[in-house]
Curated annotation (Swiss-Prot):
Main location, first listed in the record: secreted
GO annotation, cellular component aspect: extracellular region
Protein family (similarity comment): Belongs to the periviscerokinin family.
Keywords: Amidation, Neuropeptide, Secreted
GO biological process: neuropeptide signaling pathway
Alphabetized Pfam families for the sequence: Periviscerokin
Location of the protein in the cell: Secreted
Lineage: Eukaryota, Metazoa, Ecdysozoa, Arthropoda, Hexapoda
InterPro entries in UniProt: Periviscerokinin (IPR013231)
Protein name in UniProt: Periviscerokinin-3
Function: Mediates visceral muscle contractile activity (myotropic activity).
Coiled-coil segments on the chain, per record: none
UniProt modified residues of type Leucine amide: L16
Keyword Magnesium: no
């Protein structure tokens, strides 16, 4: 899903 992807992405981007 996009909604879940955006939320997880926001936390995954800085972590990467």
């Amino acid at each position: 899903g996009k909604t879940k992807g955006v939320t997880s992405g926001l936390i995954a981007f800085p972590r990467l």
